[in-house]
Regions:
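Active-site-proximal alpha-helix that buttresses catalytic centers in soluble enzyme cores
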Residues: 1-192
Length: 192
């Protein structure tokens, strides 16, 4: 929206604007993948606004992130695997890049998601920019897999800076550069 010259309101400002318009029943939907720090910040902002403005809203509900149940996990794994590049050949590996979080339930959720992807397809790994499921842990597994080509795809709602730089950028510490240095061919697919 900001690129189109439209203002992007903070959660607090958006809630105040909706209250000024007479909205009394409010539903806020998270666009986060896992219940991590940014989702927790959203919840805190909503609670802070409600506390400062008691009685303004009759009801306020905050929707959960994408992955909060085993059913969600199964559905996401199925959809993401179906969306992998059609040019992928047998034996090609895939590394999905999640944002991650270095603590709390978000890290655990993404670890479970990584295990579910790998169980569904042994040539698919999920690694995160932050948190315990780092690319450093995945790279030796890629080497051991014998894959010649490694597809790189973001596991993010918006494939922005992390995908363009950390995943597929030309810097020597990008995942693509590290895969190339390990003797494999990186195949970036930058759709989120």
């Amino acid at each position: 929206l900001a690129k189109e010259g439209k203002p992007v309101l903070s959660v607090n400002a958006a809630m105040n604007e909706l209250a000024a318009q007479g909205v009394t029943d409010l539903k806020i939907q998270s666009l986060h993948i896992a219940p991590a720090e940014e989702y927790n910040q959203l919840e805190r902002m909503v609670v802070k606004n409600i506390t400062k403005n008691p009685g303004v809203f009759k009801t306020v509900k905050v929707g959960y992130p994408l992955l909060v149940s085993e059913k969600d996990l199964d559905a996401v794994v199925k959809v993401v695997l179906a969306s992998l590049p059609k040019d992928r050949k047998p034996g090609d590996a895939v590394v999905l890049m999640g944002h991650g979080n270095d603590r709390g339930p978000g890290d655990l959720t993404l670890a479970a998601t990584a295990a579910a992807f790998h169980k569904a397809d042994p040539h698919v790994w999920l690694a995160t920019v932050e948190g315990s499921n780092s690319f450093d842990n995945v790279l030796p597994k890629l080497k051991a897999s014998g894959a010649k080509r490694v597809w790189l795809q973001p596991f993010m709602i918006v494939a922005g800076d992390h995908a363009n730089n950390d995943l597929a950028g030309p810097e020597e510490d990008s995942w693509a550069s590290r895969i190339k240095a390990a003797g494999m061919t990186p195949m970036p697919n930058l759709k989120g």
